[in-house]
């Protein structure tokens, strides 16, 4: 018989220790991976609720199981809040991840073998935008576009490729691009050749929700996002549209269920509903503005210290530090910073001579440190520490000093106070 007093600590101490160790790691490390963030205790409360027990195949009011009257309320709240947050007329909150949301869009708009124009992974795109190792690159004819010598998206090249190859779908969005995307220009190009415009705004959804980054929803036929990253919700995906096309909406819903998934994760959808409500609060806009301010402050210090930033700056939450020409790989930089309790990820940069497993760059983002309460002063100080480590990546005394400074700073700014 189940009892509410049951707990992991007593029953499975080995697992409990791993959970506790990860909790301590998050508190004592500075998180700079651009796709990571700290979700709220309210979201975690929803995810740990008895909603996890409920199967609810279908959609609100149209379920294949009984007993769904309350989970219908939960999902409807999430849908309506997502629509309000992004100015959409359609929202599907069931995708288990951003990649599965993207898969549903491909399934809706394309047939295998159709031509797609997507951002080159090496220039800042995403696996699901046409990488050969991903379903998108295996099932569709991918034409990649990229960035110019200034590190900005080359819209002239994009238009030339679109006219030449006539893709059925164009993809906007990225995983490692620090600029502002001109969604309107992309829609113009798509309309010129009669293509769908699909935007994956996973990385900037929180910035978009707060009005500090242009909203793609009015321009694209379909938009997807994750619900974590800058949005700071549970790990999951969403699909949005303002196309006012009921036939498209039905096809998108069918592509999620039954096309790609079975039962939705109702406890996660509840977490999404909470996160969307939090994102509608005025303080969320203040937070997102600070995310960008902190990123710009970090870029200034990197440039002062002689480091190259891809595109020369940032207009969002992330930056790519280009290490080409330095006696340091992205993998080595990642490891050295990790030893100092600073978590980043190695990342390929444009024209990278090294493999994706080694790389010549690191990607840095500010959503998590800003969530902890860091302002410009802390962001600048932290960046100097990062440069100290990168300048002395094999000097254990420098790494030890920086680790001590990191621990002191983390103690001043706990993740969950």
Curated annotation (Swiss-Prot):
Give the GO molecular function terms.
glycine hydroxymethyltransferase activity; pyridoxal phosphate binding
What are the record's GO terms for cellular component?
A: cytosol
Q: Which InterPro entries match?
A: PyrdxlP-dep_Trfase, PyrdxlP-dep_Trfase_major, PyrdxlP-dep_Trfase_small, Ser_HO-MeTrfase, Ser_HO-MeTrfase-like, Ser_HO-MeTrfase_PLP_BS, SHMT-like_dom
Binding locations of (6S)-5,6,7,8-tetrahydrofolate: 121, 125-127, 355-357
- Compartments (UniProt record): Cytoplasm
List, alphabetically, the Pfam families matched.
SHMT
Kindly list the biological process annotations in GO that this record carries: glycine biosynthetic process from serine; tetrahydrofolate interconversion
Keyword hit for Cell membrane: no
- Required cofactor(s): pyridoxal 5'-phosphate
Q: Where is this site: Plays an important role in substrate specificity?
A: 228
PTM N6-(pyridoxal phosphate)lysine: at which residues?
Answer: 229
Q: In which pathway does it act?
A: One-carbon metabolism; tetrahydrofolate interconversion; Amino-acid biosynthesis; glycine biosynthesis; glycine from L-serine: step 1/1
The organism's superkingdom is given as Bacteria
User: Whom does it interact with, and what assembly results?
Assistant: Homodimer.
Q: Which family does it belong to?
A: Belongs to the SHMT family.
Q: Which HAMAP family match?
A: SHMT (MF_00051)
Protein name as annotated: Serine hydroxymethyltransferase
């Amino acid at each position: 018989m189940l009892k509410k007093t049951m707990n992991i600590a007593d029953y499975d101490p080995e697992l409990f220790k791993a959970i506790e160790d990860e909790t301590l790691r998050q508190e004592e490390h500075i998180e700079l991976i651009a796709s990571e963030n700290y979700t709220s205790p309210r979201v975690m409360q929803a995810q740990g609720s008895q909603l996890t027990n409920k199967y609810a195949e279908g959609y609100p009011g149209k379920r294949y199981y009984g007993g769904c009257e309350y989970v219908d309320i939960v999902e409807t709240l999430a849908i309506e809040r997502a629509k309000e947050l992004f100015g959409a007329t359609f929202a599907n909150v069931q995708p288990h991840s951003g990649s599965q949301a993207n898969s549903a869009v491909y399934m809706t708009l394309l047939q295998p073998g159709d031509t797609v124009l997507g951002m080159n992974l090496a220039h800042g795109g995403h696996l699901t935008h046409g990488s050969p190792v991903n379903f998108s690159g295996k099932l569709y004819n991918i034409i990649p576009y990229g960035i110019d010598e200034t590190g900005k998206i080359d819209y002239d090249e994009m238009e030339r490729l679109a006219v030449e190859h006539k893709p059925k779908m164009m993809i906007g969005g990225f995983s490692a691009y620090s600029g502002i995307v001109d969604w309107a220009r992309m829609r113009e190009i798509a309309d010129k050749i009669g293509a769908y415009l699909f935007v994956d705004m996973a990385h900037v959804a929180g910035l978009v929700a707060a009005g500090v980054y242009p909203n793609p929803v009015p321009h694209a036929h379909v938009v997807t996002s994750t619900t974590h990253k800058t949005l700071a919700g549970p790990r999951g995906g969403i699909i949005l549209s303002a196309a006012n096309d009921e036939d498209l909406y039905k096809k998108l819903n069918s592509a999620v269920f039954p096309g790609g998934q079975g039962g939705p994760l109702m406890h996660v959808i509840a977490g999404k509903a909470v996160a969307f409500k939090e994102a509608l609060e005025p303080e969320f806009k203040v937070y997102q503005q600070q995310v960008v301010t902190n990123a710009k402050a970090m870029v200034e210090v990197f440039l002062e210290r002689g480091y190259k930033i891809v595109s020369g700056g940032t207009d969002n939450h992330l930056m790519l530090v280009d290490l080409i020409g330095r006696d340091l790989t992205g993998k080595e930089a990642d490891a050295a910073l990790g030893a100092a309790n600073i978590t980043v990820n190695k990342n390929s940069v444009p024209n990278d001579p090294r493999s994706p497993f080694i790389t010549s760059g690191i990607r840095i983002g500010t959503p998590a440190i800003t969530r902890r309460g860091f302002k410009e002063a802390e962001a600048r100080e932290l960046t100097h520490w990062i440069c100290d480590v990168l300048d002395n990546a094999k000097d254990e005394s420098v790494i030890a000093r920086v680790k001590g400074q990191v621990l002191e700073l983390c103690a001043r700014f706990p993740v969950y106070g």
